[in-house]
Amino acid sequence: MNPIIFIIILMTVMLGTTIVMISSHWLRIWIGFEMNMLAIIPIMMKKHNPRATAASSDYFLTQSTASMLLMMAIIINLMFSGQWTVTKLFHPTASMLMTMALAMKLGMAPFHFWVPEVTQGIPLSSGLILLTWQKLVPMSVLYQILPSINLDLILTLSILSIMIGGWGGLNQTQLRKIMAYSSIAHMGWMTAILPYNPTMMLLNLIIYITMTSTMFLLFMANSTTTTLSLSLTWNKMPIMTTLVLITLLSMGGLPPLSGFVPKWMIIQEMTKNNSIILPTLMAITALLNLYFYMRLTYSTTLTMFPSTNNMKMKWQFSTTKRMTLLPTLTVLSTMLLPLTPILSILE
């Protein structure tokens, strides 16, 4: 793709996100969603192959359906309130449709079907944008309509997402699909805490984006997309492979890594609000995610995949791609736990 065209498209994606975040008018929010969706598709199709085309088509159809649901909710709200302002959804049907549309855009269960397939079919750089930047817009709208959200519906979607995110990743060998199911589970954690403490949802979103960005940048540096190719990078880049595995464990929420912080704080906040059964179920289900991350770490470090690769240790002579942000992101993705007392300002 021509670099100038790519920059223009990327700026359009950012503009669409900005329009949604600063708007208080439903029509402008819908326009921002559409700009964002239509601009991301050429980025997903950077590599012209059938898989990228199919993934982009799936993404377009799913997001178009979600946009139609969103517009229907806006029109129902307009009929009952007579205003376009984002203040309150005046009808339960509008609230339900809006929540379902945003859940579909976020890739939450039971609307998660598109996330693994789309992520698997596109390049790593496009997958990074899809699983990080594209979550900002729906989350910002959920944050704005928080007083009107049906609590039972949003918590049901949350617990379903955490379960599907754990179960779906168990039999995967493709790293992009593992990241997609991890994203589904993290969306569940974020929306679960949203009704109780919206500020904590923002903290969780920041940590999630940091960890996911680190993972994708490490995958791009290692040129790995499967568990087999990850295990074979020990010979070439042992330090980078170690960072991949530590960050994976952080995403699973293993203490004392950064990924443990949001889970700990979310469970603590929910128990303070006399919700006991739901956080217990969430904590147990989160073990599924941790299990497949630990299994991946074990199989990569302590066992050797069947391979005809007889290459010797090349890491002393290999040159790696220079990535400026990677050291900072890696530190943030793994070592935030000692800073947890500072987060008492969220109380």
Swiss-Prot record:
The yes or no answer to whether the keyword Chloroplast is present is no
Q: Where in the cell is it found?
A: Mitochondrion inner membrane
- What are the protein's GO molecular function terms? NADH dehydrogenase (ubiquinone) activity
Q: Which UniProt keywords apply?
A: Electron transport, Membrane, Mitochondrion, Mitochondrion inner membrane, NAD, Respiratory chain, Translocase, Transmembrane, Transmembrane helix, Transport, Ubiquinone
Keyword Oxidoreductase attached: no
**One of the GO biological process terms:** mitochondrial respiratory chain complex I assembly
> Topologically, how does it sit relative to the membrane?
Multi-pass membrane protein
Report the top EC class in one word: translocase
Q: What does the record give as EC number?
A: 7.1.1.2
List, alphabetically, the InterPro entries matched: Complex_I_Subunit_2 (IPR050175), NADH_DH_su2_C (IPR010933), NADH_UbQ_OxRdtase_chain2 (IPR003917), ND/Mrp_TM (IPR001750)
Which residues are in coiled coils?
none
SUBUNIT field: Core subunit of respiratory chain NADH dehydrogenase (Complex I) which is composed of 45 different subunits. Interacts with TMEM242.
Q: Which family does it belong to?
A: Belongs to the complex I subunit 2 family.
| Function comment | Core subunit of the mitochondrial membrane respiratory chain NADH dehydrogenase (Complex I) which catalyzes electron transfer from NADH through the respiratory chain, using ubiquinone as an electron acceptor. Essential for the catalytic activity and assembly of complex I.
This chain belongs to the protein called: NADH-ubiquinone oxidoreductase chain 2
